[in-house]
Amino acid sequence: MALVACQPQPVGTGSGKAHQADTGGSAAGDFGPPQGDPIQAVLTSAPDVPPPVDRDYPAKVIVDMEVRELDLEISEGVTYTFWTFGGGVPGSFMRIRQGDTVEFHLKNHPDSKMPHNIDLHAVTGPGGGATSSFTAPGHEAVFSFKALNQGLYVYHCATAPVGMHVANGMYGLILVEPPEGLPPVDKEFYVMQGEFYTVGKYREKGYQPFDMQKAIEENATYVLFNGSEGALVGEKAIKASVGDTVRLFVGNGGPNLVSSFHVIGEIFDKVFQEGGTRYQENVQTTLVPAGGSAMTEFRVDVPGTFIIVDHSIFRAFNKGALGMLKVDGDDNLSVYSGKEVDNVYLGDKVMAEDLSIVSAVTLAESTGTATKEQRIDAGRVLYNGTCSVCHQQNGEGLEGVFPPLANSDYLMADSRRAIEIALNGLAGPVTVNGSPFNSVMPPMSQLNDDEIANILTFTLNSWGNEGDTVSSAEVAAVRAATERPKGAAE
């Protein structure tokens, strides 16, 4: 709902009445001295949000924030050293009232290797607090500020090199509620985008250090919601029920990229762009700048899984910027009739909840213990997310368009050729099981050697095919010996 003192037109009324000329704004803040006893701020980790401010006076609010440098999973089987506010990425969500006086305690854990500080965009003062909060490992800095402006604000570390601190996850959101508070909604969630720059490729297993050159070139390895691939999918998806009004507090830590924030299958009834106090109505996609925010509100009218993406779409399906809103309740066939989104649409390779199957095989292969059955299981997961749109889940393809893999004489005749096709694509006429095909398969060289090996092991041993395993070493050898078409990924 709106950051407003007046009552806006109800969401989705469709009444045809003229819109109010003023779509937002609020009563002036109460900037008098704090009243009552000091209040300890409630801090939450994404996607949770602290409860609304339930008072009608300015208070002294004490915020205790600890910086931790932690090795955490950025994707299944991939670890990264995150620098965090509050132990997670994004940092803890803070919720205060316009006119509050905030006493901010920034503590840098003794195990940290770096000094840190904090720049809160909600602060009026030099550096947004950064000049007063420089904190060495094992130390604590304290400063105070008055929340003069309402809105949804980013905070981040501003210690040199600033870009590196932000790229390692040092950002979060602080909400300054208007004096009258926010109108009630049914569900509120905290979603923050950021990109990460690793030495290894996307989903390359093991520990991955920060890559400064990639960051300078703005060539992100990962673009993620809430700090890790899969943070908002499967059992971790945010949840609502039909009829709920959902409010998303959306931030973008950057450090470089602007987010094209979109929920597939929903239209935002209201968007408070850049975290301000005026709203736009009936918005499909909203831009959230690096170091900026937006507050979106919408009513969910039908059940299903609604996919949250950065609509700069390769980031969603090839770099991880994908989440889920799962809505339960009764169908409303007058609004929407049809099947729920097919899983193969949800990711270029595989949904994050299935990554553990793939990761386990990768680990087993590195120790020489991977079995053929494990490779087939991992290959099935990867095939369903990558190949089944064209070749179909049953491997039968589409007659006259996409050749079959099931009982395929062409596939089974030459496993090395199959590797070359997976890496480099195929164009031109071929004959499969006696039928001609003349379509185009794009190179899939963005997949790593393990993934291609497991997909081929699955296809060579499914749907009546009886073949051998393909190893990642075989794929690596073909990758090294052949040249990719222009424009193919490496």
Model regions and ranges:
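Copper-binding active sites and cupredoxin-like electron-transfer domains
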Residues: 6-381, 399
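Sec-exported extracytoplasmic/periplasmic mature domains
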Residues: 107-111, 162, 175-179, 384, ...
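Conserved beta-strand positions that form and line the central face of beta-propeller blades
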Residues: 134, 287, 324, 394, ...
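Detector for the c-type heme attachment site
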Residues: 158-161, 196, 390-398, 423, ...
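Hydrophobic, well-ordered secondary-structure elements that form the walls
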Residues: 291, 310, 405, 422, ...
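Flexible coil segments in periplasmic/lumen-exposed cytochrome c-class electron-transfer proteins
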Residues: 359-374, 380, 432-490
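Sequence/structural segment immediately N-terminal to covalent heme-attachment motifs in c-type
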Residues: 372-398, 407, 411-424
